Structures are given as structure tokens and as C-alpha cells.
Amino acid sequence: MIWHVQNENFILDSTRIFMKAFHLLLFDGSLIFPECILIFGLILLLMIDSSSDQKDIPWLYFIPSTSLVMSITALLFRWREEPMISFSGNFQTNNFNEIFQFLILLCSTLCIPLSVEYIECTEMAITEFLLFVLTATLGGMFLCGANDFITIFVAPECFSLCSYLLSGYTKKDVRSNEATMKYLLMGGASSSILVHGFSWLYGSSGGEIELQEIVNGLINTQMYNSPGISIALIFITVGIGFKLSPAPSHQWTPDVYEGVRFVREIPTSLSISEMFGFFKTPWTCRREISPTPVVAFLSVTSKVAASASATRIFDIPFYFSSNGWHLLLEILAILSMILGNLIAITQTSMKRMLAYSSIGQIGYVIIGIIVGDSNDGYASMITYMLFYISMNLGTFACIVLFGLRTGTDNIRDYAGLYTKDPFLALSLALCLLSLGGLPPLAGFFGKLYLFWCGWQAGLYFLVLIGLLTSVVSIYYYLKIIKLLMTGRNQEITPHVRNYRRSPLRSNNSIELSMIVCVIASTIPGISMNPIIAIAQDSLF
């Protein structure tokens, strides 16, 4: 009898929960329509994979690509709609959040073509790779619109778990496993620190979890200037810092960038046609081919999602502690710009060089976060983030292509690449120059707008540090470009000497992404006004 009553209560509770969830989806589901498209793509991928006897179907790439493009289209149609809070205050929809969601979708859309040839070469499982990418994208999108502590914690964990799985995808490789373990341990520690900071805010505000309600709670409890808020600020800054990877929270970045790799069998002394699979040979040597598209994906999406979350957390709950978080972020920006660019000079691996370069780049982005809504700080940050996506992914596309064709990512092995593949060498040079901020490329105008906004806000010291470190970054980028263009015959390594020249017209999906990113890294800088206007229009 007791079991009967308990069973009936369980059924009633389950039905009530289901009806409430259905009610939320029915009335609030349209506000997360772009996310629903990705969820549908995930379900479709799983259904096809479970129902098909043939594994690793090549056209599976079409499903996530179509889902991402449709999600971008849905976001564009929703532009300039009134801000809405849905799902009982857990999720907020406005132009500011949507532009970050657009950037994340753009990153994922460009990263999928990078992975096609890579997965074919490594013979890795297609479905799982695409599932992880789509799920991470979904987590990043929910993080951009998160309006309470629970969503702010769960959404990045969704992204982070997929990132851990992607970084450890080549489980037979020792260095990949080592990098994944470091990434996992530091990620878990940072999440714990972040939650601890949330708990201080939760207690100080009288038990509120929504961002705006926390501000009201702090006013009611008169705790907005208490020591507990300072403790919460420190812990939350450390937790978010891991996602953004500024110095000194950057230790995982170079190791993960270099550790994510794969090993491919390449013949030692055969013709180019034999090396690329036209003939079989029984004797081969093992060479590293890197970096992977996983690194390209992690290098941009995590920073975009974390930047969106950081702006909302610092701007709303810590409204009364603006001087405190400004000081903390200024320290992080200075350390990132100086350490990132100085250490990048000494690197011999392209992956580690780009890792330290990204640490320096996030220092520039932090300037926009500090400036904030006033003086177009957020608009300059969004503009520079858009250019950074194209510059960084374009550079990674070039390096992925070079790695697939040569089996190396050592900087000295790029010597004389222009003599073998002018198209690839010029593309890499343009992306590196844009990252350095040389005119008239997009990176120059992005940095100019960012530094100008910082100068207008009175951040003179930060802007001067940014200018000096930009000159340092130009030095090590030009050093690589000089190697590409002027490598002497005796300096050309066997990797480039045996390089297979790529045709100007190619169906290679990596080259397609590379061309798109190179164009986006050069042309938009000439016509900045429309981009700036869109960024300014998105401010909340």
C-alpha cells in the first residue's frame, strides 16, 4: 500500500515537472530557437549514427554545418528585437548577447571545414568529433545569454567537458594525454573557485541567484561594500581567468596547444605521390602532424564565450565594486601583454608561439572590458574579437595545411616555403601581419579602435603597454615571414624541399576556410564604419 502511494506520488511529480518543462518550451522556446536548431542537429547526428551500419559517413559534416548556418540565420532575423528574459529568469536575450552568440557560431562554422581532411588522415570517428563541437558550441551560446549563477556554471561546464574530450581525442598519444590531464585538473580547480565566489555573492545578497536581483539584494542588505564582496570578486576573477587564459592563469594554454596532436605514417624516402597515398609501401617512419583543428576551435570559442560572461558578471553584480575589478583586470592585462609577447619570441614551435600570442591578444581584449559600456569599450572589444577570429583561424588553417603536407610544425621548417607554395606562404604572412597590427590590415584598425577607446577612458598606461607589446609581436611575426620568403637553399629543410605544391584552385575544405579568413583579415579594415556601427548598436 505504501509502495502504491509512493509510486503514484512519483508519477504525479514527474507529470508535473514534464508539464512545467513543456509549458516553458512552448512559451519561451522561440527565444532559444537558434539553440534549438543545434539541439535538433545533435539529435539527428545521433540517430543517423545509431541507425546506420556504415560508420564515419563522409557527408555527416553536412548536418552540423547546415545546423550552424541555420542558427546564424535565425540570429540575424532576430536582430534588434526587444530584450527578453525567459525560463524563469535563467536566460536573457538581447543584441549584446546575440552578437557574441554569432561570433561563437562563426568560429564553429569555420572550424568544421578545417577538420574534414584532418579526420580523414587520422581515421578518427567523425560522429563523436562533430557531436563534441556542436555541444561545446551550444554550451558557449547558453553561456552568452546566462542570467543566473546556475546557468553561468552549467553552460561553461558543458563547453569545458567537450573541450577536455576534444583535446584528449588522440588517446594513444602520451603528450596529448598529459595535456588533457593538465587541462582537466586546472579546469576542475577553476570551476570550484568560481562556484566559491558565487557562494559569497549568494550569501551577501540574501539568497539571490539572478544577476540583477543580486544587485537589488546587495542594496537591501547593505553588503555591496563588504569584505565578502571583495572575496567574491577575487575568486570569480580567478575562475573566469582560466577560461580567458590571461597571465598568470595561462599555464595550461601552451601545453594544451602543443599536446593536441596526432601521428601519421609518412614514408621516409619516397616520391611525393607515394607519400600522399597513391602507392603503398611497407616501411615508414613516424612524424608529428600538427596542430589540429581542435586547437583552432579552442583558441577562439572559449575566449569569446568567457568574454561575454565576464562583461555581464563584472558589469552587473559588481557594479558597486568597479574600482576593484578594474584594478584586477588591469593587472591581468599588463601581465598578459608583457609575458605573452615576450615568451612568444623564444618559441620554436608554431603552436606554442600562437599559444603565447593568444595570451598577449587577450590582454588587448581586457582593455575593452575595463573601458566598459562608456567610451565604446564593449564595441571596440567586439570589433577586435571579430577580427581576431578571422586572423587566428586563418593562421591555424595555414599551419594545419602545412602540417598535413609535411608532418612538422617547427618554425625553422617553414624556411623557403614561398618557393614551393606561394599561395600558402602569402596567406600565412597576411594573417600574421594582421595579428601584429600592421596597416592597412584589419588587425591594425581593430587595435587602433581598441586603444583609442582605452585612451579616451584614461587608461594611458595600459594603452602604452599595448602599443609597446604590439611592436614586440610584430618582431616575432616578421621573423617568421622573413623565414617564409627568404629561406636560402641550404636553410630549406627536407620538409619544404619535398613539399607538394598546391594548385591555386582547390577543392580542399581547409583552403576554403583559409581563403575566407584571409579575406576577412584584410578587407574589413578598409571599411570599419559598418562593423563599428553594428557593434555599438548591440550594447545593452
Swiss-Prot record:
The enzyme's E.C. designation? 7.1.1.-
- Which leading EC class covers this enzyme? translocase
Q: Which domain of life is it from?
A: Eukaryota
Q: Which Pfam families match?
A: Ndh2_N, Proton_antipo_M
Q: Which residues form the signal peptide?
A: none
Q: Which reaction is recorded as catalysed by this protein?
A: a plastoquinone + NADH + (n+1) H(+)(in) = a plastoquinol + NAD(+) + n H(+)(out); a plastoquinone + NADPH + (n+1) H(+)(in) = a plastoquinol + NADP(+) + n H(+)(out)
UniProtKB keywords: Chloroplast, Membrane, NAD, NADP, Plastid, Plastoquinone, Quinone, Thylakoid, Translocase, Transmembrane, Transmembrane helix, Transport
* Keyword set includes DNA-binding: no
Give Gene Ontology CC terms: chloroplast thylakoid membrane
Q: What is the recorded membrane topology of this protein?
A: Multi-pass membrane protein
Subcellular localization, as worded in the UniProt entry: Plastid, Chloroplast thylakoid membrane
Keyword Plastid attributed:
yes
For this chain, the family text in UniProt reads: Belongs to the complex I subunit 2 family.
The protein depicted here goes by the name: NAD(P)H-quinone oxidoreductase subunit 2 B, chloroplastic
Query: From what organism does this protein derive?
Result: Coffea arabica (Arabian coffee)
